[in-house]
Structure formats: C-alpha cells, structure tokens
Regions:
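Bacterial N-terminal signal peptides
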Residues: 10-21
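Extracytoplasmic ligand-binding site segments that recognize negatively charged/polar headgroups
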Residues: 31, 46-59, 70-88, 92-225
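Short amphipathic alpha-helical coupling segments at ligand-binding clamshell hinges
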Residues: 57, 195, 199-202, 269-281, ...
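A ligand-binding cleft/hinge motif common to bilobed small-molecule-binding domains
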Residues: 103-107, 227-246
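Periplasmic-binding protein-like
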Residues: 127, 141-142, 170-179, 200-204, 209-211, 281-304, ...
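A bilobed periplasmic-binding-protein/Venus flytrap-type ligand-binding module shared by bacterial periplasmic
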Residues: 147-152, 188-190, 258-270, 289-290
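Extracellular/periplasmic bilobal clamshell ligand-binding domains
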Residues: 305-341
Length: 341
C-alpha cells in the first residue's frame, strides 16, 4: 500500500499520521481485543523517538492491523510529561500509549496515569525491565557507555575503570551531559553515595566540559573538541560510526542501561488498539524492528541486538524508582559537578 505520512507540529510536537485499510487477526490475540480495536480504528502514540523510527514501528503495526489509523506526537523528556499532565488537568487526554526514557516518565507511574495490562509478551522480559504490577515494560533499553575519539585516544591509554578518567592526562579533555541524573543516581545506588560523589568531584577537578544533550556531545567528540565522553548512549556511538566519525565505545563496569518505558493511558480513548500496540512492540517481531533503530532489546531471541556488543561487563537496568528522589539527586549532581542553576 502506498502511504503518504502527514507531518504537523501543533503545540511544539511533531505529528505523524498514517492511514490504513483492513486486518488479519494475530495468532493468540483475543477476539475481544481485536473486535474492540476495529471499532476504535485509531491509536495515538506519544514518544520521544525520532519520526523515522516511530514511522517504521507504526507502519509495521498497521500492516499487521490495517484497520487502525495511527498518529504520532513527538516530544522528549519533561516536555512530553508536561503535555500529558496538562491534558489530564484539562480533562482532554487524547493519547493511548506513551514511550519515554529517564526519570520524567516515572513521575507518571507515581501519579497513577497508567493502566495495568498483563501483556503476554511481558514474560520474555527479565526482572528490572518491567514492573511487578503490569503498568509498564521496557520497549527498548539504551546502554550508557564511555565513548572516545579514536584519533585522540590510543588503545593503550584507555581507562580500565571509571576512576581512571581522573588521571592528569584527561584534564580538560572530558565531556558529560549537564543533566545526566539517571546515570548518576544509578551509580550512586551501586557504588554508594560517598564513592559516587567523590567521582563527580573528581570530574569537576578535571575541568570537564558540561553540555546539554548527548547528541550534541557526540558531535563535539566526533569533531575532536573533547577526547572522551564519560557517558553516552550506545546507539549514538553506532550511528556516529555509521556516518564515518572516528568514535568507539568502551563498556566500563557497571554499564547503566536506561529504560525506554512504554505504557497505556488509564483513560485511553482507544484502549484495545493500545493493547495491540503493546503486544506488538514487546513481541519478537516488534523488538527486531527496535534493534534496527540501533536501540537495544532485552529479549534473548532477538538477532542483531546492539546489547550483544557489550561483553564481560555487568549491565545494570536503570532503577526508575530512584526518580522519587529527583530533587535531591539533581541538586547533588549540580553541586558536585559545579553545574550552574
């Protein structure tokens, strides 16, 4: 079928709408959900992933269930959460499913925005990549790795542990996201507060370059403006290497892996279509589409998984519940790194 996606930008969001035709029932899917989704005929997906990545997933969903018309609203982090909260206060919630990373979406878990759904595919996801109650699961995971410029750092210089980055040779040559709270909070949990704070203070003494956004940092690294990024998403490294940038990743223990949480709105206008989306996104078929976007899957039966590049190092799933202490974590991070308020 020839599709002509429409891109709009209401309220600062990118919107992708695709139109489709009629379905073949999915094996194992209950008839009630299928019939309900046919009557609903729509799915509205809020997420921060790039439009091409969302289009790939939604187009595949529509080929499987062509009785659905999907609409994609794109915004990231706090902007996405703010949009959802604003809609709720106004009584005009229009979203069915949301996907986001970081502590911001966990606030929605705490505030009761999500519906329980015991998706059959959840059983393929290990502990730490789903909650026990059935409100959310990890649609993808983003391992956080050290990244270096291969023109500026020789293999013999590579750090063997995080504290090696505090050696004099790296002074003025390091970069880090100025709001990397999820990474810090999880290091703090694993290492203990004293060790984690000592590490941040050491980075500050190294005159580390603090910049908002990992994509921008990856560009600075590729251009040689810094030699090493203390923390970066693995998918950013893979994408930069594909474009010919002289970058490589280094997995130091522990690798914190951020969760790309996916959940259904408890007031979803199209709840059955939302369940179809969750079933598809968590399935082997859906996860194999996810890994083609350079994001990682925690399913063991997915091929071409970027997560498989990380070997012999502990990969710790991010504990989203640490977001309960968001203010304290943010203030510590700013204080010990010297981030401007």
């Amino acid at each position: 079928m020839n599709r002509s996606p429409k891109l709009l930008q209401p309220f600062g969001f990118v919107v992708l709408t695709l139109f489709i035709g009629w379905p073949a029932p999915a094996r194992g899917q209950t008839q009630d959900v299928l019939e309900g989704a046919k009557k609903e005929g729509q799915l509205i997906f809020y997420a921060g992933i790039p439009v091409p990545d969302a289009q790939a997933i939604l187009s595949a969903l529509e080929r499987k269930y062509p009785f659905i018309k999907t609409t994609f609203y794109r915004a990231t982090g706090s902007a996405l959460v703010s949009r959802i909260q604003t809609e709720q206060r106004a009584g005009t919630q229009i979203w069915d499913v949301m996907n986001a990373t970081g502590f911001e979406p966990y606030a929605l878990v705490e505030q009761g925005y999500f519906a329980k759904y015991a998706a059959p595919e959840r059983k393929a996801f290990p502990e730490g990549h789903k909650d026990n109650e059935g409100y959310w699961a990890t649609m993808y995971t983003s391992p956080m790795v050290v990244t270096y410029n291969t023109h500026l750092v020789s293999t013999g210089e590579l750090p063997k542990e995080y504290f090696d980055l505090l050696q004099p040779r790296w002074k003025g040559r390091l970069g880090l996201d100025s709001s990397d709270l999820e990474w810090y909070a999880n290091l703090r949990k694993i290492w203990g507060s004293e060790k984690a704070q000592k590490f941040l203070q050491g980075l500050r003494a190294q005159e580390i370059r603090l910049v908002q956004g990992r994509s921008l940092l990856t560009n600075l690294l590729s251009g040689g403006e810094v030699a090493i990024l203390v923390n970066n998403f693995l998918q950013n490294v893979i994408e930069a290497k594909r474009k010919g940038s002289p970058v490589e990743f280094l997995a130091l223990d522990p690798v914190i892996s951020a969760a790309g949480l996916v959940a259904i709105n408890k007031s979803a206008p199209h709840p059955n279509a939302a369940r179809l989306f969750i079933d598809f996104a968590l399935s082997k078929e859906g996860q194999e589409l996810i890994v083609k976007t350079d994001r990682s899957s925690v399913r063991k039966d997915v091929t071409g998984n970027p997560l498989d590049l990380i070997k012999n190092v502990r990969v710790a799933p991010s504990d989203l519940s640490l977001g309960k202490d968001y203010i304290r974590i943010r203030d510590e991070y700013r204080q010990f790194l010297g981030v401007s308020q």
